């Protein structure tokens, strides 16, 4: 029987990256669990205080909750399995599991950009149109907008997964520590022009479009604050630089993950495949609950109060 692509049925893949880091797998496992645990704790605290405190039932805090929950979803699709695989010595993943992980990672990535954009727009309205803000950005509007964006993202990510399903796999070795769409496309026998075009156009459209909106909103916000007072100006610039740092690390990682296969002429170092996703989707994204939650005064105070209650010590 001929072993042509049409006759090859792939049910499992090998995550080569896990084999490459075998010598220090316990260190990586501890790091993965630490990042996931911190993210889970911070996300839980932010969501809990926002849900229970009526004073926080406002668009800005709703958006912060949506962002940290999305970060939690992204980390949950990556770090727990990574830690389990490293501790157990397992380096394989099923086709179904691979597609599910790819779907969750892509959904997290696209929804994160839109959340950044919505938050920038919300702050622009709050500073630039304070008298109309509560009419323009109600809780219902925020929730409806976020839900519509989420559904849109589910659709575009599902289309990407379906485009992969129509292909035939010729290999099983994924040069990474987890599954994502570009890794799978590198293993197919068919022409992937449609897949590459779809992802490239979508990535450029979303990234550039959202980046322009974010830049416009924050620049306008800073300009308005400069006209108010020196204190407001200082706070706005400090907040803006924090947001730019978090967003820049995130967007650079997304672009790298999407273009590394299409732009490279040879195999990419497995160590690079490990370091970039770990920093980009791990440490950088896990910082979001701190950046957007703990640096927000109202949230920070409520979280501290709840922590004092947990340890049974009255706040001084």
Segments predicted by a language model, with ranges:
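Transmembrane helical core of 7TM receptor-like proteins
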Residues: 1-316
């Amino acid at each position: 029987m001929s072993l042509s692509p049409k006759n090859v049925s792939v049910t499992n893949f090998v995550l080569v990256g896990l084999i490459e880091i075998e010598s220090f797998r316990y260190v990586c496992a501890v790091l993965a669990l630490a990042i996931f645990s911190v993210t889970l704790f911070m996300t839980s605290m932010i969501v809990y205080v926002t849900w229970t405190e009526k004073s926080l039932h406002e668009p800005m805090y709703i958006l912060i909750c949506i962002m940290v929950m999305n970060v939690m979803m992204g980390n949950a699709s990556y770090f727990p399995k990574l830690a389990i695989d490293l501790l157990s010595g397992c380096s394989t993943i099923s086709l179904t599991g691979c597609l599910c992980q790819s779907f969750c990672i892509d959904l997290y990535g696209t929804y994160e950009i839109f959340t950044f954009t919505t938050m920038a727009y919300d702050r622009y309205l709050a500073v630039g149109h304070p008298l109309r803000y509560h009419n323009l950005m109600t809780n219902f509007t925020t929730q409806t907008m976020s839900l519509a964006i989420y559904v849109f993202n589910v659709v575009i990510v599902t289309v990407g997964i379906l485009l992969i399903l129509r292909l035939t796999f010729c290999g099983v070795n994924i040069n990474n520590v987890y599954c994502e769409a570009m890794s799978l496309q590198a293993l197919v026998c068919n022409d992937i022009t449609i897949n590459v075009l779809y992802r490239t156009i979508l990535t450029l459209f979303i990234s550039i479009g959202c980046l322009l909106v974010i830049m416009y909103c924050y620049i306008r916000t800073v300009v308005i604050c400069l006209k108010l007072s020196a204190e407001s100006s200082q706070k706005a610039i400090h907040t803006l630089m924090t947001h730019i740092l978090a967003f820049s690390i995130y967007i650079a990682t997304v672009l790298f993950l999407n273009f590394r296969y299409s732009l490279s002429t040879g195999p990419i170092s497995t160590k690079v495949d490990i370091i970039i996703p770990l920093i980009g989707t791990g440490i950088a994204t896990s910082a979001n609950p701190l950046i957007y939650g703990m640096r927000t005064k109202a949230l920070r105070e409520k979280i501290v109060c709840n922590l004092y209650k947990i340890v049974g010590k009255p706040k001084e």
